Design a protein with these regions (language model features):
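N-terminal amphipathic/basic helix or basic patch
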Residues: 2, 6, 16, 91, ...
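Long, low-complexity, intrinsically disordered segments
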Residues: 561-589
Length: 589
């Protein structure tokens, strides 16, 4: 999480008082102040829209989650009871989590961390993973729905992967030169996805970074279009946010504006934004898209993406489909096969890597040739015909990961009779059965949430699902639900993405449903949800929205700079006033 996102999270979850929020705001660089104001405005409108879209009768659904500032002594007492219980059941994990901090730098350790829940939020230390289950060093067993962030389609340590890796280890794993798994894995990858050539990288982030380099090399253009809400890894080349003027801005510490300047950030599914692509086509090398965003799985704008494909073909722009999570999940040839929208390039990395650190780029030969110059014959006068873009990596064709990939692809092909460029259906692909189980589980839980009138839904696509808390998306109750699920035997992921796998039995799924319901019922019993005055809060939201002015983009007009500064000062005062209103009236933005 970047500094600016951390501040926003503190404000929207009401973890800080208004004076502290203002102090943070004043210390921000000017571009991040713009970003923060823009995001606060967006969050206000989105919060209202989410509730209205998911609950048609607001009068019958008036429960709200308490915020961290609203926790009373009874809430704190219950949290303390749970902390004591967890310390009794997982003492070794807590001790090891504390020991690790001194030397191990963990970027995930503070994800979702709440001061009120800190005693409950240490990471578990696992002793093993097997099938659908994780076991910690205190001998506790958990149903795993984190699925190693989407890697484990077949669960932990399936026999066919263990056998393939073991055989490769016995032969050694030379990193220079080819091994027999290389040609087999790339051929099978191409057959299953319908792409012509394949490149292995060392991570998903690296795959996306190289795909962008290929797009720029092929088109001799610089700009890359990305969409708000997407996640494409941690390369500076794809990390930018959009300010209130629609300009791309660097997202946080260590990220420079020059990288953000080469990105165009648009709204995914907004047909009007296609005009921006058309108007700036001469600058744009590629459009990078998660066809179904892992952070927003309910947003599935098929018609929009079809128009993007049509436009990119017309304008000499590469369409890069990031199927890091959806690839080999929704069906063998991913969302591209399901929606019949093929990218020029596509990136992969989780399922086909089989748990090994890897990424893949696949695509049309004419573009993939920018990596190695193209195919030539060793026995004639032919030579590489395309000028190469610089790419390298010691572990790109590591034989251990290739053995794992080959075993995964072989298993998928064995279980799915769908042929190349054919869409999976319920009669031909084992993945459809898994997708249906996920749908049924999520729909049962969504019905439960509606009956209980809690502001929570599960959004899902294929076997991916996410818990979305509607009124306080980053709040203490959200994290407490996950803590209680863990304490009752279901492990989730700090990223928020959850998955069912082939290894989950019907009994496991029933247990997941039971434990989620139990966790919500516990928080209802302990008054972590309360009845709100929805009419009064609607009026407050409307007043706040009308109070915040629209600021024209005056960045290129020096004479108007003082006007902009005056307006920023007014916004600054409005933020203070808004925060005061939110806290006094207990409104969650």
């Amino acid at each position: 999480m970047t500094v600016i996102d951390d501040i926003l999270e503190k404000i929207v979850s009401k973890k800080i008082e208004k004076k502290e929020a203002l102090k943070f705001f004043e210390e921000l660089p000017e571009n991040e102040k713009n970003y923060m104001v823009s995001k606060l405005k967006t969050h206000l409108s989105n919060s209202v829209n989410m509730v209205e879209n998911n609950f048609s009768d607001k009068k019958d659904n008036t429960l709200k989650a308490v915020t961290e500032l609203q926790l009373n002594e009874e809430h704190k007492g219950f949290i303390d009871q749970m902390a004591q219980k967890l310390e009794r059941t997982a003492p070794k994990s807590k001790e090891n989590a504390s020991k690790c901090q001194e030397y191990f730098v963990d970027q995930r350790r503070t994800g979702g961390l709440k001061k009120a829940l800190k005693r409950l939020q240490f990471h578990l230390t696992y002793s093993k993973g097997d099938g659908a289950y994780l076991y910690d060093i205190d001998d506790n067993k958990y149903i795993d729905i984190a699925s190693d962030n989407g890697v484990n389609l077949f669960g932990h340590q399936p026999a066919f992967i263990k056998e393939a890796i073991s055989k490769r280890l016995d032969k050694g794993y030379p990193l220079v030169g080819y091994t027999e798994e290389l040609s087999q894995a790339t051929k099978l990858f191409s057959e299953l996805t319908g792409h012509e050539r394949v490149l292995f990288t060392q991570s998903g982030t690296e795959a996306v970074m190289w795909a962008i380099r290929i797009a720029r090399a092929a088109t001799q253009k610089k700009k890359i279009v990305i969409f708000e809400g997407a996640y494409h890894g941690l390369s500076d080349t794809v990390l930018a946010a959009k300010d209130q003027f629609g300009n791309s801005i660097a997202m946080g510490l260590g990220m420079i504006q020059e990288f953000a300047d080469e990105l165009i950030v648009l709204d995914y599914g907004n047909m009007d934004d296609l005009n921006i692509i058309e108007d700036r086509a001469d600058e744009i090398a590629g459009v990078l898209v998660e066809p179904v965003q892992s952070r927003n799985p309910a947003n599935q704008p098929i018609d929009f993406l079809k128009e993007v494909r049509k436009l990119t073909l017309e304008k000499n722009i590469l369409l890069v489909m990031d199927e890091m999570i959806t690839g080999f999940r929704v069906c063998c040839n991913g969302v591209q096969g399901l929606w019949k929208i093929k990218g020029d390039l596509a990136t992969y990395g989780k399922i086909p890597a089989g748990g090994m650190p890897s990424g893949m780029i696949a695509g049309l030969t004419k573009y993939m040739n920018y990596v190695d110059g193209g195919v030539f014959d060793y026995d004639d006068n032919s030579m590489p015909s395309v000028k190469k873009a610089l790419m390298a990596g010691t572990h790109t064709r590591n034989p251990i990961k290739l053995a794992s990939t080959l075993s995964i692809l072989t298993e998928i092909k064995k279980r799915c009779s769908t042929s190349e460029n054919e869409t999976c259906d319920s009669n031909s692909c084992f993945l459809q059965e898994l997708n249906e189980k996920t749908r049924l589980m999520c729909e049962e839980l969504n019905s439960f949430f509606k009956v209980k009138k809690v502001p929570l839904i599960i959004e899902y696509f294929s076997s991916l699902f996410r818990f979305k808390f509607l009124d306080d998306p980053n709040g203490v109750v959200k994290e407490f639900v996950f803590v209680l699920m863990r304490m009752n035997g279901v492990e989730t992921s700090p990223s928020g993405n959850c998955f069912l796998t082939v290894a989950h039995s019907d009994k496991d799924i029933k247990s997941i449903i039971r434990i989620v319901k139990k966790s919500i019922d516990t928080l209802l019993k302990e008054n972590f949800f309360y009845v709100s005055d929805s009419i009064e809060e609607d009026e407050i939201e409307e007043n706040i929205q009308s109070a915040i002015p629209d600021i024209p983009d005056m960045r290129n007009d020096p004479e108007q700079e003082s006007i902009k500064n005056d307006q920023m000062e007014k916004l600054r005062k409005l933020i203070i006033s808004d925060l005061n209103n939110f806290q006094e009236k207990e409104v969650t933005i």
